[in-house]
Swiss-Prot record:
Pathway: Carbohydrate metabolism; tricarboxylic acid cycle; succinate from succinyl-CoA (ligase route): step 1/1. Keywords: Ligase, Nucleotide-binding, Tricarboxylic acid cycle. Succinyl-CoA synthetase functions in the citric acid cycle (TCA), coupling the hydrolysis of succinyl-CoA to the synthesis of either ATP or GTP and thus represents the only step of substrate-level phosphorylation in the TCA. The alpha subunit of the enzyme binds the substrates coenzyme A and phosphate, while succinate binding and nucleotide specificity is provided by the beta subunit. The active site is at residue 247. It comes from Haemophilus influenzae (strain ATCC 51907 / DSM 11121 / KW20 / Rd). Substrate binds at residue 159. It is an enzyme of class 6 (ligase). GO terms for cellular component: succinate-CoA ligase complex (ADP-forming). HAMAP family: Succ_CoA_alpha. This is Succinate--CoA ligase [ADP-forming] subunit alpha. The gene is sucD. It comes from the Bacteria.
Amino acid sequence: MAILIDKNTKVICQGFTGGQGTFHSEQALAYGTQLVGGVSPNKGGTTHLGLPVFNTVREAVENTGVTATVIYVPASFCKDAIIEAIDAGIQLIVCITEGIPTLDMLKVKQKLNETGVVMIGPNCPGVITPDECKIGIMPAHIHKKGKVGIVSRSGTLTYEAVKQTTDEGFGQSTCVGIGGDPIPGSSFIDILERFQQDPETEAIVMIGEIGGSAEEEAAIFIKDNVTKPVVAYIAGITAPKGKRMGHAGAIISGGKGTAVEKIAALEAAGVTCVKSLAEIGEALRKLLKSSKN
């Protein structure tokens, strides 16, 4: 099962012939992802990496039956690229690009809400279902097929959680980087709900950070809806108020969005919060052992 993507997912790349699109498409193909082509305006009719290039997403859909796209285009063009994909009937959009203007994302978010299309990102590492499909920039070799679902606002912190779950022998069902921007395509709740419904996912790792209220909202959802064990890590416990810490969304404003508040909300919902990333594997081991007893 897994969530969002599997071995049957057909993918195209928008920004296919650019430097980033080329490199990460090569990596995806090497992993076994069903990348069936790409889109680069004015280059339709040519081939790249042995795959067809189309001028528009609609042409790609009509010719390949693709259902997912990954976007590697500059921030100023992302809104149009995302909306083009939605209008063409793509069901899953993964946008890696950082720095999309907030007003552009507001328009995108409205379109997503109107159509029900799923978007992961922007400013994210992407999605991977180990040994089946990789859409994004994550290092493939640290992943192992297994039973832990991982959802995170951070890219590199996700990789640490992945490495620990691999080393512990648990592996991952699917790993989703929802991104660190203030307006994400998908929230923690969207992904937690999918993991709760997925029979292959036995436990969940959630990695949050300061800023916004996504973790507090997730805590309410977990308390009422999630029966599987959840381990969480919140980055930024020492962050000063009013200073952006890496991601655009990682800022404590008006005294809200602190790590302490988020940890308290999650613990009140029954989530096991670890103080260090290094403790994720051990915490999972204890939770999974106790859940079987």
